[in-house]
């Protein structure tokens, strides 16, 4: 061993450890994608709280709780897809447990659950409000919103709010599926290497 300021051991330049200190590529990919998947789940939770804020008036109505400030907002009643999408947050626990244990099957179930409970409701929302958004996008500047069939909330087209939500939701869930797929691929490659050896 070399001492500080002392002579170097003969036969080495101090770099002989580099080839032994590398982490295998599949482990690097797994670690990177686990971190990114957790960020996506965090953003999914943030979107859930946005949806929960929208659903609060309906939930309070079902519980027979009256809050004047919330009632004054006159939030439109929710559609079924909003509750289905809000329930998609529960799938995050499946994804987190799969990531913690490197479980391929559970991660695949998580991907299917995200597709069914998060992405499909967003597609429904996209199709449901398409006519309003298209009419708003092609509207002449001389025509007032109140003169059209476009559903308006607080002076703005309601469908445009949902399109903004869908835009962010598609990005979050798309990246979630991408990172989950990369994890499944890395874990399968690692188990295939173990079986081969």
From Swiss-Prot:
The membrane topology term of the UniProt record is: Multi-pass membrane protein
For this UniProt record, the keywords arranged alphabetically read as follows: Developmental protein, Differentiation, Endoplasmic reticulum, Membrane, Oogenesis, Transmembrane, Transmembrane helix
Task: State the organism of origin.
Answer: Drosophila melanogaster
Q: Which residues lie on this side of the membrane: Cytoplasmic?
A: 1-39, 100-109, 181-197
Role description: Required for endoplasmic reticulum organization and proper vesicular traffic during vitellogenesis. Required for oocyte and bristle growth.
Cellular compartments annotated:
Endoplasmic reticulum membrane
Q: What happens when the gene is disrupted?
A: Mutants can't increase the size of their oocyte during oogenesis.
Which family does the UniProt entry place this protein in?
A: Belongs to the jagunal family.
For this entry, list what GO says about its biological process: chaeta development; chaeta morphogenesis; endoplasmic reticulum organization; establishment of ER localization; exocytosis; oocyte growth; vesicle-mediated transport; vitellogenesis
Locate the transmembrane regions by residue number.
40-60, 79-99, 110-130, 160-180
Q: Any extra detail in the entry?
A: 'Jagunal' means 'small egg'.
Query: Which Pfam families does UniProt cross-reference here?
Result: Jagunal (PF07086)
According to UniProt, the name of this protein is: Protein jagunal
Q: Which residues lie on this side of the membrane: Lumenal?
A: 61-78, 131-159
Against InterPro entries, the record matches this protein to:
Jagunal
